[in-house]
C-alpha cells in the first residue's frame, strides 16, 4: 500500500513531486491504540484515541493518511479534499482493512451532533455535526483510493473491510464543582454509549460506504475494536 501511495496514486491523479512521504508504522501487538497528533501513531493500549484488541497475532500496518495527503498541499488534488486519519490493515494474512477517523467532544455524545460551521463563510456546512463530517471524510477517502485501479485491487483482497469512526469524550479541566458534575455526566454518557455499541462498535447503515463493500462502525474510546470481527 505504501508503494501504491507513492507511485500509483500520484500517477492516476497527475501529481508530480520528487519526494512523497507516507507516514507509516507497524506492530504485531495484540492490543494497541492509535493517536492523532502524537509523536508516534501507534501508542500503548488504552492511552490513545481508539483501542484495538486483536484475536490473531500478525503484522499490522498503519498509514497516516491525513499526513500523507497534507504532503500534497498546494495542489488542486489536496485542496478541499476530505480525508480520514489512518489506514490500518493486516499486512500478513489480509484479514482486515480499516479506514479510521478520530474525533472528540466535550461532556456528552450530544455535542457530536452540533452543526459545524464553515470557518470562512459562517454558514452551516455539516448540519449533522461531527457524525455527518466523519461520514463524509470516510466516503471521500474511500472514493479517492478506489479510483486508483491498483489500490482498488489491493483493497478487495481483504476479508473484512471497515470504515471506523472513533471518538473520545473529554471533561473541562477546571477543578470546581461544576466541572466535577460535568465529568460525572460524561461518564454516564459513556455508559449509555457502551450499551449502544458493545465492545466492537455500533454497526451503522451508510449507503455510500456499504455499496463499496465496507461496514460502517462507530466506537467510543474505553471500548475496544476487534479487527478480525
Walk through the language-model features, giving the residues of each.
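Catalytic cores of nucleic-acid endonucleases
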Residues: 118-170
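Catalytic centers of nucleases
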Residues: 80-89, 134
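Short acidic, S/G/P-rich loop/turn micro-motifs used as interaction or catalytic elements
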Residues: 75-78, 94, 105-109, 173-178
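Sequence/structural signature of beta-propeller domains
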Residues: 72, 108-120
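Conserved catalytic cores of phosphodiester-cleaving nucleases, focusing on short active-site segments
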Residues: 86-88, 96-107, 119
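Basic, amphipathic N-terminal segments that precede the first structured/catalytic domain
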Residues: 1-81
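Short, low-complexity, polybasic intrinsically disordered segments
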Residues: 166-229
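Short, solvent-exposed secondary-structure capping/transition elements
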Residues: 95-99, 108-112, 147-155
Amino acid at each position: 500500500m505504501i508503494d501504491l501511495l507513492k507511485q500509483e496514486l500520484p500517477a492516476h491523479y497527475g501529481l508530480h513531486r520528487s519526494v512523497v512521504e507516507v507516514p507509516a508504522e507497524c506492530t504485531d501487538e495484540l492490543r494497541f491504540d492509535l493517536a492523532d497528533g502524537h509523536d508516534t501513531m501507534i501508542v500503548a493500549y488504552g492511552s490513545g484515541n481508539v483501542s484495538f484488541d486483536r484475536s490473531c497475532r500478525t503484522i499490522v500496518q498503519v498509514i497516516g493518511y491525513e499526513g500523507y495527503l497534507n504532503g500534497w498541499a498546494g495542489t488542486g488534488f489536496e485542496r478541499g479534499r476530505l480525508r480520514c486519519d489512518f489506514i490500518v490493515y493486516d499486512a500478513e494474512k489480509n484479514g482486515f482493512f480499516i479506514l479510521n477517523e478520530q474525533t472528540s467532544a466535550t461532556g456528552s455524545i450530544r455535542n457530536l451532533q452540533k452543526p459545524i460551521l464553515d470557518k470562512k463563510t459562517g454558514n452551516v456546512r455539516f448540519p449533522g455535526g461531527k457524525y455527518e463530517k466523519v461520514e463524509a471524510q470516510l466516503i471521500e477517502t474511500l472514493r479517492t483510493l478506489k479510483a486508483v485501479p491498483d489500490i482498488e485491487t489491493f483493497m478487495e483482497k481483504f476479508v473484512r473491510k471497515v470504515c471506523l469512526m472513533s471518538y473520545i469524550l473529554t471533561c473541562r479541566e477546571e477543578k470546581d464543582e461544576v466541572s466535577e458534575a460535568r465529568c460525572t455526566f460524561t461518564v454516564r454518557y459513556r455508559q449509555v454509549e457502551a450499551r449502544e455499541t458493545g465492545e466492537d462498535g455500533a454497526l451503522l447503515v451508510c449507503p455510500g460506504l456499504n455499496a463499496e463493500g465496507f461496514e460502517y462502525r462507530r466506537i467510543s474510546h474505553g471500548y475496544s475494536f476487534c479487527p478480525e470481527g
